């Protein structure tokens, strides 16, 4: 929280100050998510999947061999009844819970910057909501937490634009009102193409560096807010 405080942001609710919507740390809320996932299963908005990693990988490779984008084929939705799923779970068989994305129609959302965005449902995958270890995936936990915490506005990077239609399908399946979205572009920087492992420049056939424009990221050695403070930069300048 130190970085947020340094920017001058002050919050009246959270892990360090408490409030009516706690707990605020996801691992302390882990018992909530399976309950909501099973609510979706009962409503038909999700289903239990017993496919092994090997089966999924074989299907993925088969799709790649055909030049197709892999999507889970809903095999467990069509072949495993809810009663059978509950028996197999009671017997200790590993499983995940997947979102049951419609195969027809549109999924859409409204963004304050990009306006109305919609995609064909048949292009979306049945993403995992609850993993085999019982923990929620990031996307599912976000939807549940935002609803329970009465979040009115969701502001995040454009890398989450492609996830928003599936978020709204979850809101619809639950019968919840979705938040107002604002997807903002990341901070970009002029750089050169580098190797992901060594972080060294990748040269072209003439031995020259290859200029690119990329997202500012610590993964590539760019300084963080705290790094800049330690180097003596004033926070007022960084905030600009």
Give the location of each predicted region.
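A conserved beta-strand/loop capping segment in the N-terminal third of enzymes
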Residues: 8-13, 29-37
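Hydrophobic (often cysteine-bearing) scaffold residues that line and stabilize catalytic clefts
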Residues: 33, 163, 234
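A glycine-rich helix N-cap at a beta->alpha junction
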Residues: 2-25
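Active-site cores that bind ATP or allylic diphosphates and position pyrophosphate for catalysis
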Residues: 39-215, 224-225
